[in-house]
Amino acid sequence: MHDTFKGYVAPWECDEMGHMNIQFFADKFSQSLLRHLFFLGENSKGTPGTLRALHMRFHKELHASDLAAAHGEVSAFEKENGVLTHFMRNEENGALAATASFHLPLEKMPDEVTPLASEAAPRGLTPGLLFRPGMEAHEGLTETNLSAVRGHECSAEGGLSLKGYFSRLSDCQGHMWRLAGLGRQEQKARGLATATVELHFQFFGALGEDDLIAVHTGLDAVGSKTLHYRHIFFNGKTGAPVAAADGIGLLFDKETRRAIALPEAVHESAAYHRL
């Protein structure tokens, strides 16, 4: 186990939900991964161009002025492929905030492999529910993001950073909830907010400076309190899919911070955008 990150939640990293936005979890975890790879003697920088997948679970919110700390461990290694799992905690009370399991090639045999902790293991997003090649052509998808990669969003290696992907995912969420029948303004009027509790990102290609991005979104399943959404990232110049994110989202009451049942309008609207 290696201590790999220690930082602070700045007020500007928090959104209208009252907690740290998902893109800043991604940013802090990517810094944590970079230090872990250094400790392991790896040359990889762990950028999306080298990552195969990333699985995240969110357990407790982090708020402005909270202290965040992370450590990493090797959860699997086989035939030069590894899984590095990172745990981020609120350093004030020790509560586990989130986990991130990075699937990537490793050049060296690690000294120690620790079985994947239950807190980091897939829960709602089992392998059979995830995006598979060919699904990008599904008619149920709706365009939720059109953007371009700016230079400041890229790593030293030239590709769009993990935070850059998650920044767009965060933007897409507002459009996704509107598709689901409960847009941001109505949420605000009703004292509601949204959160992602589990996320699985897959990477198939790289995006560089000035590349165009298009994201298409659909809903795969809706339960009593959660919905399964999918964002597919395309290279806007070639039309090729470069990444896909499957997530489990929920609604919560902003006052009690507790999850609530999805309104009937969500079930009705989601039926028109289901994958």
Identify the meaning behind each predicted range.
Residues 2, 49, 95, 138-140, ...:
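A generic structural signal for short, non-catalytic loop/turn and secondary-structure boundary residues
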Residues 1-60, 64-67, 178, 253, ...:
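Hydrophobic, helix-prone linear segments
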Residues 45-52, 80, 96-97, 195:
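A short glycine/small-residue-enriched secondary-structure motif
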Residues 3-5, 57-67, 74-137, 203, ...:
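HotDog/MaoC-like acyl-thioester-processing domains
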Residues 51, 72-74, 196, 219:
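A structural signal for short, hydrophobic beta-strand segments that form beta-sheets
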Residues 8-14, 52, 56, 148, ...:
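A generic, residue-level signal for flexible/boundary positions that often mark functional hotspots
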Residues 152-246, 250:
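Structured core of small recognition/catalytic domains
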Residues 1-35, 39, 124-185:
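Catalytic strand-loop segment that frames the active site of acyl-thioester-processing enzymes
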